[in-house]
Amino acid sequence: MKVITAFLSVFVLCSAEDDDKLTVASNDLGMRMLPLLPSSPGENIFFSPYSLSIAMGMAYAGAGGETRQELHENLGYSRAGLPEAEVLDAYARQTQRHLSDPSNTTVDVANTAAIHLGLPLLDEYETILRNSFNADLQKVDFVENGQGAVDVINSWVKDKTHNKIESLFSEPLDPLTRFVLLNAMYFKGTWKTEFQKRRTEQRSFFNGGVTQAQVDTMIGKIRIRHNSFNDVGVDVAELPYRGGDYSMVILLPQEKTGVEALKTNLTAGLFKTLLDRLVQRQVTVFLPKFKFESKYSLKEILQNMGIRRIFGGGADLSGISGDTSLEVYDVVQKAVVEVNEEGTEAAVVSAVIGGLRSGSFDGFEFRVDHPFLFFIRDTRTNAILFVGQVNHL
């Protein structure tokens, strides 16, 4: 009998074909960011490297000089082997896949740019937003009608996330704000094999790997891809959604308090290796139901990852409007997730905000009863859409 008791779960977008370079860059960005996000035994993590990559891609499109070079290096394009000249074409291909690729799982991706009335965009930048990101433009007044501007943004966010995220901003932005580049993504997937509600029962989950709590736990005997990796100290299960295009991958440390060490050592390469070594088998899965949201200001984290120039000190975003005095103030992301017997529903919005400088079962078991990581992925492109860490339920 194999028992898995804590987990890291990842929602990933993956393909049977080789990873494209933009996907490699996005996944690498997510794995490097995961250990830098604030975490505690009483605080969960949920974010989307995929959404962040798209929002930052729209900023990259307007960057020049050393600012663009720094973004190219630290957004993962360089280490993925994606030349500067091919980045925007890669986003265009990714956008086209979303527009033309049907699936049994709902994945809606939308982009927009909220632009201050007094900021004339360069024609070339407008063309890039439309062709590479299918982004629409919304003219707002951050100076004279700041509340109206955030109302427009929040309304767009609510619509594109199917009402899962009702607002991103609670108050007007700085009057010096000149642009907000936004990506929103909504995900709804039904398990290939749904859990029966009548089998859901109260079972133990060890919050922080230590404190025992009773939580609603789904139980099902399911044919999934699964394996144990004693050399890494982790058990892994991949739960497919209907249609097979998307899956949830759960990384469960073999030690109840091992999620932080797992998170620190996890890389995109190791993640792929673990997936490649999974075996199809019948497994009794114990998975807690959960629902939570998160919101992050990512400026400091991105700076720690090497992205500094865009936030001031010589930022070159002249490709947006020709104005050399633009910089990014912050990058924020808000995400929500719910996992239950039917499947998973998740939504995320990422925003790049910028403006003028101021001064006991038979067989195998997978028992998720302590902190874990989870990933939602596309099984066709290997892109990791969402990453989460559950510490407390």
Curated annotation (Swiss-Prot):
GO terms in the biological process aspect are: immune system process
Supply the name of the protein: Iripin-3
Q: What does this protein do?
A: Serine protease inhibitor that modulates blood feeding of ticks on vertebrate species. Moderately inhibits host plasma kallikrein (KLKB1), matriptase (ST14), trypsin, plasmin (PLG), thrombin (F2) and coagulation factor VIIa (F7). Slightly inhibits host alpha-chymotrypsin, tPA/tissue-type plasminogen activator (PLAT), uPA/urokinase-type plasminogen activator (PLAU) and coagulation factor XIIa (F12). Slightly inhibits the extrinsic pathway while not affecting the intrinsic and common pathways of host blood coagulation.
Expressing tissues: Saliva (at protein level). Expressed in salivary gland. Expressed in ovary during blood feeding.
Q: Which InterPro entries match?
A: Serpin_CS, Serpin_dom, Serpin_fam, Serpin_sf, Serpin_sf_1, Serpin_sf_2
Assembly notes: Interacts with human KLKB1. Interacts with human ST14. Interacts with human F2 (thrombin).
Tagged with keyword Acetylation: no
Instruction: Fetch the Pfam families from UniProt.
Output: Serpin (PF00079)
Record has Signal as a keyword: yes
Positions glycosylated per UniProt: N104, N265
The subcellular location is: Secreted
Q: Which UniProt keywords apply?
A: Blood coagulation cascade inhibiting toxin, Glycoprotein, Hemostasis impairing toxin, Immunity, Protease inhibitor, Secreted, Serine protease inhibitor, Signal, Toxin
Induction: what does the entry report? Induced by blood feeding in nymphs and in the salivary glands and ovaries of adult females.
One of the record's GO molecular function terms: serine-type endopeptidase inhibitor activity
Give the similarity note.
Belongs to the serpin family.
Q: Kindly report the protein's main subcellular placement as a broad class.
A: secreted
Q: Which residues form the signal peptide?
A: 1-16
The entry summarizes the disruption phenotype as follows:
RNAi-mediated knockdown does not affect time course of blood feeding, feeding success and weight of fully engorged nymphs.
Pull one GO CC term from this UniProt entry: extracellular space
UniProt xrefs under CDD domains: serpinJ_IRS-2-like
